[in-house]
């Protein structure tokens, strides 16, 4: 099976677990890390600000399990629009805490179209721990 098919299939299975009663915009995420694979889906809340994005859900699982290095990010959004599925700004910043600038971020839409980015392309001026020195 092709790489695209494996990750798209897993993301497609996960996306149905998203809790999105308000926006109906589902997102699933897989992180390849120093501890293996971690998954997340978006979880909405009626107050909106407590909503958790799929990427941060996966990062939380990774950290809870004792791991801290992200090597690859895979994301599926339930849209057929090209290029709509990149992480939001908050998620980009959170990912930058645990991933290198050259970390691949691979996104899919529901048609299975695949788009490639690096974290640095999506967050060129990341605020990081070096800024706090």
From Swiss-Prot:
Residue numbers binding substrate: 42-44
Enzyme class: hydrolase
Note accompanying the cofactor annotation: Binds 1 zinc ion.
Domain CMP/dCMP-type deaminase as annotated: residue spans: 2-130
Co-factor(s): Zn(2+)
Active site: 55
InterPro entries: APOBEC/CMP_deaminase_Zn-bd, CMP_dCMP_dom, Cyt/Deoxycyt_deaminase, Cyt_deam_tetra, Cytidine_deaminase-like
Reactions accelerated catalytically: cytidine + H2O + H(+) = uridine + NH4(+); 2'-deoxycytidine + H2O + H(+) = 2'-deoxyuridine + NH4(+)
GO molecular function terms attached to this record: cytidine deaminase activity; identical protein binding; zinc ion binding
GO terms under biological process: cytidine deamination
Sequence positions that bind Zn(2+): 53, 88, 91
Gene3D superfamilies found in the cross-reference section: Cytidine Deaminase, domain 2
GO cellular component: cytosol
E.C. number: 3.5.4.5
Record keywords, A-Z: Hydrolase, Metal-binding, Zinc
UniProt-listed Pfam families: dCMP_cyt_deam_1
Annotated NCBIfam families: cyt_deam_tetra, PRK05578.1
Function: This enzyme scavenges exogenous and endogenous cytidine and 2'-deoxycytidine for UMP synthesis.
Subunit organization: Homodimer.
Similarity comment text for this entry: Belongs to the cytidine and deoxycytidylate deaminase family.
Family annotation (PANTHER family): CYTIDINE DEAMINASE
Protein name, as recorded: Cytidine deaminase
Gene this protein is translated from: cdd
